[in-house]
């Protein structure tokens, strides 16, 4: 995969050269490029923003520097890149979207600053995406998060496919609790079932705990989750237990 990031602060993406994303680059699985679109500004002061027509607060990113930067980024004519505009008004980013984007050959992220974008910039864009229902100073932090979430899903980046398939949200549920050595730490013991070696009992425990955590912390996820018969029975028991505690 090739990822291009347009930003006036390209130095903010240094962390993407470390850890999993850095290793993906070392393996040749990922090609990551940052582009300072200020370098393509044609005015003497190299401004990339200006006042909005019609008045209003703040400054808007001008189209020219971004268009000219995009013109210099190589793309395959037969399979153009997905071009993502980081915008708080965009569609909210989630695990399903990360999985979808990980299937692409090329992604381009445009990071905004100031009050917003000149509307004409959006003619370059295939997707407008938001990290969440809040406003950041710029799009760089959001782009970093999204790149990390996407790259780890590319085949060959993580050691085993199961490494990310068991992650929270990958199955539609939150991940079950996990433990490592020692068996007993300051009186806190590892659940016996996990040391039993009984794979079916371990599977059932993990599923139940995953459902329990989701029910307690993110019940909204269950609204769009389609449980099987086994999961329905577990959820019913968990809800009954919660009701007993309330009463």
Curated annotation (Swiss-Prot):
In the record, biological process GO terms are:
tRNA N1-guanine methylation
Q: Which ranges form a coiled coil?
A: none
- One Pfam match: tRNA_m1G_MT
User: What EC number(s) does the entry state?
Assistant: 2.1.1.228
| GO CC terms, sorted | cytosol
Function, please? Specifically methylates guanosine-37 in various tRNAs.
- Protein name as it appears in the record: tRNA (guanine-N(1)-)-methyltransferase
**Organism for this UniProt entry:** Lactococcus lactis subsp. lactis (strain IL1403)
Instruction: Please name the gene that encodes this protein.
Output: trmD
